[in-house]
Structures are given as structure tokens and as C-alpha cells.
Swiss-Prot record:
PANTHER family: PYRUVATE, PHOSPHATE DIKINASE REGULATORY PROTEIN 1, CHLOROPLASTIC
Pfam families in the cross-refs: Kinase-PPPase (PF03618)
Gene3D superfamilies: P-loop containing nucleotide triphosphate hydrolases
Catalyzed reactions per annotation: N(tele)-phospho-L-histidyl/L-threonyl-[pyruvate, phosphate dikinase] + ADP = N(tele)-phospho-L-histidyl/O-phospho-L-threonyl-[pyruvate, phosphate dikinase] + AMP + H(+); N(tele)-phospho-L-histidyl/O-phospho-L-threonyl-[pyruvate, phosphate dikinase] + phosphate + H(+) = N(tele)-phospho-L-histidyl/L-threonyl-[pyruvate, phosphate dikinase] + diphosphate
Positions contributing to ADP binding: 149-156
Family: Belongs to the pyruvate, phosphate/water dikinase regulatory protein family. PDRP subfamily.
InterPro entries reported for this sequence: Kinase-pyrophosphorylase, P-loop_NTPase, PPDK_reg
Coiled coil regions, renumbered to chain: none
EC number of the protein: 2.7.11.32, 2.7.4.27
A single GO molecular function term of this UniProt record: protein serine/threonine kinase activity
UniProt protein name: Putative pyruvate, phosphate dikinase regulatory protein
Organism, as annotated: Rickettsia prowazekii (strain Madrid E)
Keyword vocabulary terms for this entry: Kinase, Nucleotide-binding, Serine/threonine-protein kinase, Transferase
Amino acid sequence: MTKLIIHLVSDSSVQTAKHAANSALAQFTSIKQKLYHWPMIRNCELLNEVLSKIESKHGIVLYTIADQELRKTLTKFCYELKIPCISVIGKIIKEMSVFSGIEIEKEQNYNYKFDKTYFDTLNAIDYAIRHDDGQMINELSESDIILIGPSRTSKTPTSVFLAYNGLKAANIPYVYNCPFPDFIEKDIDQLVVGLVINPNRLIEIREARLNLLQINENKSYTDFNIVQRECIEVRKICNQRNWPVIDVSTRSIEETAALIMRIYYNRKNKYHK
């Protein structure tokens, strides 16, 4: 199997370069990859340390660096080593500048911008934590999105991912033979999404969870008929109310959240023209 080394160099958290790399790597199933993360590279001394690592471990370099001198040093070094050096957002910034007629700012301000978006994200994260697993149902009216589904269908991580995108998401578990909150009988403005999964896959996940917690008494938790019934009931609840249902059997959390956001914004645009 071909091995590919990728160096992710950033003057910030390296997440932008990491997302770009992972998106590209998803197109290659036969590549074994090794990613080296080099965050907070903001001066020549730190960059030189990274360059020595790149020299010892040749590979593609993906970078997001605002400082012009640091960029020049990095690209020149990679050129001499004859290895690719790619600016993740450089092309985007250039096209924005050309299209808008606004010059690119030469100086980089490393102080994070504490704007409304930042505080909306913090509030959404706090909301997701406080309204996890059916907690504080009386405050559902404050949410943007409500996720329902059987236990271990990725409701919690999906809620957190949505929160990082500024959306307040509550999640409520569906448990076999347990009464579901009466909010489903009311007309609500929030987007409600049901999450289901292949029963066999869900049993595997639940068994792994029980083994991790060293629990071997909860047989109904991994009983196929009960697990299957839980997924069927969630579909039934959603179908009766025209709520969307997402099968997460083969989806990553990011994919599930992205699909939910698409539904949410399509719905928002439809009713708020």
C-alpha cells in the first residue's frame, strides 16, 4: 500500500488544513497516510523547527499562514526539496480580492475576533450539553433542532457538532416501552430529526459500550427484536408528523450533521423568505 506523508502547517489551530487533507484523502482508499500537525507557527524560529522535520520526512505540505515572509520561507524551502507546497486558502483569498477589488491586508492580527458568531457558538455548545439525553425538556422551545432516536445513534456528538456551527440542538432518546415526552403531540416550530441505524450495527455498538463499562446484565439493551422495534417506532413517530429521518448506519457524524444543517437551512429559507 502506498504511503503518503502530509505536513499540516498553520499559524493557528491547523484545523482548516486538516479538513482539506482529510477531504482529499477520502478520495483515495488505497493510500496509507501519515499526517504531521504543526500548529501556531508564527515566527522564524518555530518555522525552522518545522522545516527540519519536513526535510527528514519528505511529503506534501499544506499550509495556512498569513505572514508573507513565513510563507516565502516555507514555499522556497519546499521548492528546493522538490516537494509540493500548497496554500489551502490562498487561491480563495486571491479570488476574493480580485472580485471585490479590495486589497489583502498585509498584517495579521492574531487576536481572535470575539463577535456575535463566536458567542452564538458558545451558547449553542452550552445548550447542547444542558439538553443532552432528554434533559430539561421544558426548554425545548429555545432549540433550533431536536434529535430523537434510540440510544447510541450518535445523537450527542451530532448535537455538539451542530453546536459548533452555531445551532442549538437538544436530543431525546427513544427507549422501548418507555413513554416518550408529550412534546411530540404539540405543534412545534423546531426542526425535529429522527436518527436510526441498522439494528445489527446498533447491537455491535451497544455491546462494545457494555463491554467498556463491564456491564453484562442488560440483555434487553442488545436484544435484536427490541433494537429493531426501537428503530421502527422512531421511523413511525417521524413519518406520522412529516419529520425527516436519517439512517446513520454508514454516515460519519460530520456527514449526519451536514445533512441536518442542509434540511434546517432549506426549511428556514422556505418559511422566512
